[in-house]
Amino acid sequence: MTTPLTAFGHDPWWLVLGKALAIFVFLMLNVLVAILLERKILGWMQLRPGPNRVGPWGVLQSLADGIKLALKETITPGGVDKFVYFAAPVISTIPAFTAFAFIPFGPVVSVFGHRTPLQLTDLPVAVLFILGLSAIGVYGIVLGGWASGSTYPLLGGVRSTAQVISYEVAMGLSFAAVFLYAGSMSTSQIVAAQDRVWFVFLLLPSFVIYLISMVGETNRAPFDLPEAEGELVAGFHTEYSSLKFAMFMLAEYVNMMTVSSLATALFFGGWHAPWPLNMWAGANTGWWPVLWFTAKMWTFLFIYFWLRASLPRLRYDQFMGLGWKLLIPASLVWVLIAAVIRTLQNQGYAHWTPILVISSIVFAAALVLSLRKPFTTPHIRALRRAAAPPGQAAAHRAGFHPGIPDTAAAGESAGGRE
């Protein structure tokens, strides 16, 4: 079922307002649930109960935290640029919510007698618009770090800038193959192109690259370098408290939902029902697709929680090397392969599908196997042993450091003299 672009822009004002309000409520409720579930899942994975004090089984903990932040005293550090300091959380939050206007939740439905798509609006370049909004949201992080007048927030903002520049390139290149096979950059048209086969099965390398890039784009573990507590206290929001801090956290979780929803729309069929539910004739009609879409989005949110509980934070050089040395070159090569196979399809070659699937699996496997390469650093002691003459091999045993006396060797010499 295709939703043409001409279906947008004809809703009455009250229906547009109702859609916008529904998206806002949907995001706010999902943020409350996501924060609670993240803390619960982390607790279960770390063999502890997690939040269990406010409400039955701790289900009201997120609401209590939000009320607490709203009622806390607003503390403004001395020496800050007040206008930029207060504007930064707003700049981060507004683009995060705006991006959801282009996410398709379902097909055309009837609302009080009006036929309308379950999407606020769409554009011929909607995916690029979402990519641009995510880049604008980073301005809030950079400005917040700069306006705080402190070293740690400034370093967090600079890290965030480098992170977005690096991983938005890889993310954009992962979209290119999707645009080639969907024939459109509109989110609703891309979802319609996956009516029979989801793009994750045809364009697996694009999905793997996007999956890694979306974690880096949202500053989440193991790529949470802009707010690394062991290095930068709390990063760009070190000097923020009360509602301003809550707005930064809200923007972070809404951005997680935005990139998760975009992954659902671009690679997992959007609101189309998964197998075997798609065998039911009514699975992709009415309001049921909203349920399928939400379930897919939450699958990606669970991956976020799982990664945070499982993987340690990367070093900054490892993180940047992953983007520039692996993801971007791999994206360029895969786009070239996908374009060649698309050309074969356009020229009427009958067996383009198995060629694309096999190429996709082989390239994705090679990409996953290459993920360790940017992280491996030659062991300095091994290099020292290899460079040392044979007679000095004993001097390079474990525990030896240049400029530090080898106490064991000194003791042996003293014993020999006695």
Curated annotation (Swiss-Prot):
Keywords for this protein: Cell membrane, Membrane, NAD, Quinone, Translocase, Transmembrane, Transmembrane helix
Region (Disordered): 394-418
Segments passing through the bilayer: 15-35, 83-103, 123-143, 164-184, 197-217, 262-282, 287-307, 321-341, 349-369
Topology within the bilayer: Multi-pass membrane protein
PROSITE patterns named in the record: COMPLEX1_ND1_1, COMPLEX1_ND1_2
EC number annotated for this UniProt entry: 7.1.1.-
Keyword Transmembrane helix: yes
Subunit comment: NDH-1 is composed of 14 different subunits. Subunits NuoA, H, J, K, L, M, N constitute the membrane sector of the complex.
This protein's name: NADH-quinone oxidoreductase subunit H
